[in-house]
Every structure is written in C-alpha cells, then in structure tokens.
Amino acid sequence: MIVKYGGNAMKSLDLRRAVARELGTLRGAMPLVVVHGGGPVIERELAARGVASEFIGGLRVTTPEAMDVVEMALCQLNKQLSQDIGQAVGLMGRDDELLRAEVLDPQLGRVGRVTGVNAGLLRTLLGAGLTPVVGCVAVGEDGEALNVNADTVAGAVAGALGEGAVFLTDVDGVYRAYPDPDSRAAQLTRAEVEDGLAAGWIAGGMIPKVRAALDALGRGAPFAIIASGMTAGVLAQAARGEAGTRIVP
C-alpha cells in the first residue's frame, strides 16, 4: 500500500511521530511505501532565507534558488521520517532516477509532472523488508531537480506497483452533505465522484483530493482512500474499510 503523508498532519511533531509509529506497526501486516510532501517545512525554510513564495493555480512557482531550498527541506524531513518509522530507507526522487519528470509549465519554473517510476528499486527494498520513504523531488529531462506534487507522486507510485493508495489529509473522507457526520461516503466509484464534482457536493478543498485519487486510479492503482491523518490508528482502519472514503474504478 502507498501512503501519502503531508500537509497539516505534519505540523505537530507528536502527531507526526504517532503516525510514524503506526506506519512501523502496519508494515508487519503489509508492504508499505510512504510518499511525503513538506509544505509547512518548505514555507518555513523559504521564509527564513527571505525567498518569496508565489503560487499559480495552487502550485508553487519554483525558481532555481527556491528549488535548492525545497530539496534541502525535503531531505531533512525525509531523514526524520525514516528514523521515526524505523527499518525504513529514505529516498529522494532523484536517487537512482526513482522519479522521472518533465517540466509542467515554464511559468512555474522547476515544477514537474511525473513521467516514470523506478518500480524495480522499490520492489527490491520492499523485498528486503524495508519501507521506502520517498521525498518528492524528481530528476528532469535535463538531469536537474524538479519539484513534483506529492499527491501525484503517490498516484504514480501506486500505479507503477499496482497497489492501492491512501491519502492522509485533514478530513476523514468525502461527505455527501458536509458537515453532517452521517453523510460520509464509505465508498465511491469514479462515476460517482465525477457526479459529485458536477453536482457540487464535492467542493472546495476536497476537489484536489478527489482529483488526486482519480489520477491514481488512472495510473493503474486498484483503489484510493482519502482519510484523516489527524487521528491515531486511522491507517489500519482505512485498510480494513472502517475509515475514510475508498474510491474505486
């Protein structure tokens, strides 16, 4: 199973370590690949160095100067997460060309779209009983680093390995009538998600989350789950279908 971890769930050190412990425990039941972003950490490091943050369409404009800071921040976070999980191998997407990408839009600078995953490397590590922890910096066609979206990376890795993806976020699933707690959908098909987007009951911050789930399905993942990363124990519950929203083809 591929677990995408990031965002607000990373802001609390105690919560981050609790999730890492859960990942370490769950690894005994199933092979795991962890994909992480680092938005809050990156913001802090950029601000500390006086590098301005600019976004276009929700994506960070990444100058060469900003790319250096992004890669440094993700490397530090990658090492910390790997240590917290235990029996894990921290990898950046540039290691052994784990993640290959092309420039998404010249206006965004060093921002990429994933075009390939070194699935063989991941399978080798999983076969050795290790948990790959992947930071989202890819190698571009020019050999230089590209900043890639963690949700998209998780979907690409899930598709390359033929495994399901779990997107840990700050909400506990997709609701048909948010915030009514009884309206959380346990499972949705791709068609139902598209209907929800068209009808407007999937809206706001949930839109990019379900888009990431649909992208994972489109890349070959058998399912994608959106679940809360703010609650201890949710990963095992989501794997059993007891938490979050499972999206299927």
From Swiss-Prot:
UniProt keyword Kinase present: yes
Single Gene Ontology BP annotation: L-arginine biosynthetic process
Keyword Nucleotidyltransferase: no
Binding positions for substrate per the UniProt entry: 38-39, 60, 147
Annotated transmembrane regions: none
Keyword vocabulary terms for this entry: Amino-acid biosynthesis, Arginine biosynthesis, ATP-binding, Cytoplasm, Kinase, Nucleotide-binding, Transferase
Reaction equation(s) it catalyzes: N-acetyl-L-glutamate + ATP = N-acetyl-L-glutamyl 5-phosphate + ADP
Enzyme nomenclature, EC number: 2.7.2.8
Cellular compartment(s): Cytoplasm
Gene Ontology annotations for the cellular component aspect, listed alphabetically: cytoplasm
Coiled-coil positions: none
Enzyme class label: transferase
Functional pathway: Amino-acid biosynthesis; L-arginine biosynthesis; N(2)-acetyl-L-ornithine from L-glutamate: step 2/4
Site (Transition state stabilizer): 4, 209
InterPro entries found in the cross-reference section: AceGlu_kinase-like_sf, AcgluKinase_fam, ArgB, Asp/Glu/Uridylate_kinase
Molecular functions (GO terms): acetylglutamate kinase activity; ATP binding
Protein family per UniProt: Belongs to the acetylglutamate kinase family. ArgB subfamily.
Function according to Swiss-Prot or TrEMBL: Catalyzes the ATP-dependent phosphorylation of N-acetyl-L-glutamate.
Protein name: Acetylglutamate kinase
